[in-house]
Amino acid sequence: MKEMVDYGIIGFLIFLSVIVIAIAIERLWFFATLRVDDYTDRRKLELALHKRLTLVATIGSNAPYIGLLGTVMGIMLTFMDLGSASGIDTKAIMTNLALALKATGMGLLVAIPAIVIYNLLVRKSEILVTKWDIFHHPVDTQSHEVYSKA
């Protein structure tokens, strides 16, 4: 059961962090190569910009709960060991509680960067939509030339 907490919960959290990093790299590459003048419809641009961002937000908001699940399982294991042992082994109790807290820590370690990445990507997409607005509804001709290269 300890392996389920260690490899199952923590392994799943590591997998989720890899997904967040992969999406962040893909989105940053997409944003860097995007030309706002390629889109004639703002709605299509917004759809393209927000692709996969919901997944990043979902991972960021749920990773602490997954870590908490690992903590609850680790504490349950500790109580099971206490109940089945004839004597009290403080070292075993502390080891099991440390394992339980490790799951919570991993959940936070995944969640905090995921939320930061999500916020940065949403802000960058808002900037690109604003550049699209400036390009398609210019107030002066100079702004049209500047933002057509974005």
From Swiss-Prot:
GO terms for cellular component: plasma membrane. Keywords: Cell inner membrane, Cell membrane, Membrane, Protein transport, Transmembrane, Transmembrane helix, Transport. Belongs to the ExbB/TolQ family. It is a multi-pass membrane protein. One of its GO terms (biological process) is transmembrane transport. The chain crosses the membrane at residues 5-25, 63-83, 97-117. It comes from Helicobacter pylori (strain J99 / ATCC 700824) (Campylobacter pylori J99). It holds the Pfam family MotA_ExbB. It is found in: Cell inner membrane. This is Putative biopolymer transport protein ExbB-like 2.
